[in-house]
Amino acid sequence: MLNIGARIVNTSRMRTIQATRSYATKGAAPVTLKNHKYTVHATAAGQGRKGEVKSLDGDTPFSLHLAMPKAMGGKGEGTNPEQLFAMGYASCFLGALQMMAGKTGKKDAARNAVIHTTVHLGEAEGLGGFGLAVDIKVEGVEDEELIKAGHEACPYSRALMHGAVVNVSKA
C-alpha cells in the first residue's frame, strides 16, 4: 500500500471581485475551470455542526442531520463534515485512479482498487483555528506510477495541492 498525504490549512490570500471574495492557496496559482461539467448546490442551516445540510440537486436529493463528534464534546448522533469530506475524497480518488488506469492501458491494475481516506481535524499550526490533514491508502493496486497519476488527476487532490477558487459573497 502506498500512503499519499494531502494537507490543507487556511493559508489564503484574498482578491476582491466586485462584492465577491475569491480565496486561493498562498503562493500558488489555483486550479481554474474553463467550463462547468457538473454543478451541485448544498445548504447548511441550524447550529453549524449541529444543524442540517441538504442538496436538492441531481437525481437523488438528500438531507442529513449533522452532529458534533464525541471526540469534540458532542454526542456523535449524526454525520459530521469530516465524514462527508472523507467519503467524497475516497470516491473521487477511486474514479480518478480508474480513469487513469483506462487512459494508460492498465485498466486491470485498478479493477480491485479500494481507497481508504482518513481526515484529521486539528489546530492549524501558526494560524489559529482548525485545519485538515488527509491520509489516503490505496489497496489492491501495486503500480505506484498509476497511483501517482490518479492522485494528480483527482479534483479533490488538485484542490488541496494547488488550491481552488472559492468565491464568498452575501446571499
Question: Could you describe each region identified by the protein language model?
Answer:
Residues 2-87, 94-171:
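Extended beta-strand/beta-hairpin segments
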